[in-house]
Swiss-Prot record:
Entry keyword set: Cytoplasm, GTP-binding, Ligase, Magnesium, Metal-binding, Nucleotide-binding, Purine biosynthesis
Pfam families in the record: Adenylsucc_synt
GO cellular component terms attached to this protein's record: cytoplasm
Biological role stated in the UniProt entry: Plays an important role in the de novo pathway of purine nucleotide biosynthesis. Catalyzes the first committed step in the biosynthesis of AMP from IMP.
Binding residues for GTP: 12-18, 40-42, 304, 330-332, 412-414
Quaternary structure (record): Homodimer.
Cofactor: Mg(2+)
Residues annotated to bind Mg(2+): 13, 40
The species this protein was found in: Synechococcus sp. (strain CC9311)
Listed GO MF terms: adenylosuccinate synthase activity; GTP binding; magnesium ion binding
Protein name: Adenylosuccinate synthetase
Annotated localization: Cytoplasm
Amino acid sequence: MANVVVIGAQWGDEGKGKITDLLSRSADVVVRYQGGVNAGHTIVVDGRVLKLHLIPSGILYPDTTCLIGSGTVVDPKVMLGELDMLISNGIDISGLQLASTAHITMPYHRLLDLAMEKQRGERKIGTTGRGIGPTYADKSQRSGIRVLDLLDEARLRDRLEGPLSEKNQLLETIYGEKPLDPEEIIREYLAYGKRLAPHVVDCTRAIHEAASDRKNILFEGAQGTLLDLDHGTYPYVTSSNPVSGGACIGAGVGPTLIDRVIGVAKAYTTRVGEGPFPTELSGSLNDQLCDRGGEFGTTTGRRRRCGWFDGVIGRYAVQVNGLDCLAITKLDVLDEMDKIQVSVAYELDGERIDYFPSCSEDFARCKPIFETLPGWQCSTAECRRLEDLPAPAMDYLRFLADLMDVPIAIVSLGASRDQTIVVEDPIHGPKRALLSA
């Protein structure tokens, strides 16, 4: 038995969906522990492209239980849309479970999210506009609506009365928006609750029962380390904790239940929205990475900012998450490059540093110090074993493993499941990896 956390080691969009999908074959339970529909992952199965935002990738395996944990925030309309999409594709959803204590994104959360971002003007933070921040804010202020509230009309009315009155006042007087009708909301969300009811469970009890039965549990994070509310590039962050420690809080387990932590990182770096990005490229190189990598957000459709691999934030992700091994994705995107650069340190105000500054203003002044490696200029998309890779590609992977001081367990070379080199099974294999410096 092994219980594994999968996290993003960059700014999200690292390809966690594919890696989680691969690992779900060996998992009995997959738990999404934080975030909401602001995240998105794309999975290609038998030529079908499936885009999910909230439901764990493990739903594609009929014998796998998929649990949306207490640390998530749930937009029931979007979730039910995903369920309908899966059903229309012939996918069994009977294994899906939803924590009764997960918080609900309400209509006023989305309206406030968009209104506040608009009001920030040039100081915008790049929100997806899905209401995630306001939902988590209400959770912290103890005025949120939870899944269990949608199952009881009297309780929903009681919980909604105060928050909705307050939000309507904000919408009208501050943002010039029309107030929301409480009866419409109650009817709509009770209907959502009725459809979701068969999937609602006690999250902590369900996970601990699985652990007692010695089942393999996979904890799936959304977004990435540098978007973590406490450890990321604040204020250009999400409103939850994608780091591995967030799995314990969002799923309701102690740290001793976690056996291994896997970090997922692209062979280069991307970022969506605002915020500092030291290795960001411009011009034709940026366009080449964006076009070859299909770098457009699953959730927003926004074009991602692209840059070279940043070993400084990579080492930081290793430390913050306690990574045991790495999955490197999209190596094939670099196939046509004649040379590849990797940031090994920064220059900050004339001084060389090898750490991630906690102040975003300092981080914005950091200039990358690069090492240049030769490209391989041939296709890796059909490689299925390490020995199939061209020598410069192997050298590049070893360089990353040495730079981050963590071994590589998985290499992804395309969107399809079979476009993968599994150096080591992170769930059933020994606690080691074969690809290191």
